[in-house]
Amino acid sequence: YDMNLLWNAEEDIRSLKSLILFGVRGMAAYAHHAMMLGYADEEVNRFFAKALFAVGEDWGMDALLPIVMEVGEKNLKCMALLDKANTETYGTPTPVTVPLTVEKGPFIVITGHDLHDLKLLLEQTEGKGVNIYTHGEMLPAHGYPELKKYAHLKGNFGTAWQNQQREFADIPAPVSYTHLTLPTKLEV
């Protein structure tokens, strides 16, 4: 698809198609996370094709607006699927107090919202003397019983994903990006 067709389209059409693209993009991340845990929904999966097809067509607002609304409906369904996948895999989360200080010693920061990647990192670093700190959207991981049982999941570092460049600039540790990455200063 020639994206210039979208970017040069009339403002309302461009806006509706952008809503579809950005909504499907986020939904794809949630669907992928659920799929990594063995959960999928065929209705959600089929909708990806329908939504992307709509972006490629020369449709007016009357045809695109229902697709935009359906993006919201399918996103809600996809979030419910991911919630089911996460709770059935990692347990029902409960509110917890999460330390915001970093202990002395080696550590890794993990950012994004892929709990499966966090679980793999926790398994690989268990007993190695390396502490793990969440960042941004990974913060809720501390509430899941199957994740908080790891003693080296120590706390949360920093704030939200859009502050990655500033917050990661001088930390003496590697960062594992699972999603929502901004280019570092060296990449800009």
Model-derived segments and spans:
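Catalytic cofactor-binding cores of redox enzymes
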Residues: Y1-Y144, A169
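Conserved small/polar residues in nucleotide/adenosyl-binding loops
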Residues: T178-T184
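Short, low-complexity, polar/charged sequence segments that are solvent-exposed and flexible
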Residues: G127-V130, A151-K154, T181
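Catalytic micro-motifs at enzyme active sites that drive phosphoryl/nucleotidyl and oxygen chemistry
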Residues: T97, Q162-Q165
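Substrate-binding cleft of carbohydrate-active enzyme catalytic domains
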Residues: A173-S176
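Acidic, Ser/Thr-rich peripheral helices and adjacent loops at domain boundaries
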Residues: K148-N163
